[in-house]
Amino acid sequence: DGFLNVKPSTSKESGKSMSTVSDAQVALNGTYRRLTSSNYYGRRMLTYGDMKGGDFGVPTLGISDDALYTFAHEKDRNNYYSFWATLYDVILQSNNILTNIANGNVITSSTAEATTLNDIKGQALMIRALAHFDLCRLYGYPYLKDNGASWGVPVVTSILDPFAKPVRNTVAEVYTQIILDLNAAIPLLPTAKRLGNMNQWAAKALLARVYLYKGDWTNAYNTAKNVIESGGYTLYSNTNWVGSWAQPNGSES
C-alpha cells in the first residue's frame, strides 16, 4: 500500500531541480546527515586532537586511526584525505542549497514558507562556514602564526565543475569568508532552542570561536558573552558531567 514508495527525507533525484521549500529542507537534511559521517563529526573530527595529543592511546597499530596517533601524514592515507573529501562534499551540498535559493529556483507561497526558507539559508551558510573553518584548522597553519598569511584551503562558494582545481586561499582569506557567512546567517536564524538544528546562538558561538582562533580577543569576548547572557545554555555541573555523555542532548546543546 505504498510502503515501498516513501520518498527519502535526506536525498532527492539529481535530475530534478530544487523548486519548493520542501525540496530545500530535504537537501538541508542531507547536508546535516553528511556532518555525521565517520570522517567528520561522526567520529574522526571528535577524536583527531585527542589521538594526536596523547589523551587517547592506540593499543594495537594497524587499525584505521593509528596514523593519527603516530603522526603518519601521507596524502594517500584514508585518515587524512577523507577529511578533505568529506568536508568539501558538505560545502558542495551547502552551495547547492544556497545557489538554488539565490537563483530564485525555490518558490515560496506564504510568509511562513519565506521564513522557513530564510532559516534553511541561514543553516546552509553556517554549515558552509563550519566546514571551511574545520578544513583550515586541519590543513592550514594557525592564524596567529603570521596573521593569516600562510596558505589555508580553497574557499568554495559556488557549485564547481567536477574537474575544477581551485587554488588555495590564505588562512586570512578563509577566515574572512567564514566570518562573512556567519554574519549573514545570524539574522536569518531563530533564537529559539531546538534540538538537531542550528540556531542563532549556535552561529554566534561558532563566530566567537573563529574570532578566538583569529586572535580578535574583543570580538571573541563580546560574541561569547552575548551567547552566555542569552540564558538558553548552561555548563554541566561536575556532578552531571559524566552522565551527560549518555544523553543525546542537554543544557549545553
Positions of PLM-derived features:
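Conserved, well-structured interaction surfaces
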Residues: S64-Y139, N169, P187-P190
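Extended ligand-binding clefts on enzyme/binding-domain cores
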Residues: V21-S22, V26, E173, K214-G215, ...
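Short coil/turn linking the two alpha-helices of tandem helical-hairpin repeats
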Residues: C136-Y143, K193, Y213-G215
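Membrane-proximal, proline-rich intrinsically disordered regions
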Residues: D1-D50
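Inward-facing hydrophobic residues that define packing positions of alpha-helical scaffold repeats
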Residues: L28, I91-S94, F133, Y175, ...
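Short coil/linker segments at helix-helix boundaries
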Residues: T108-T115, L138-A172, T176
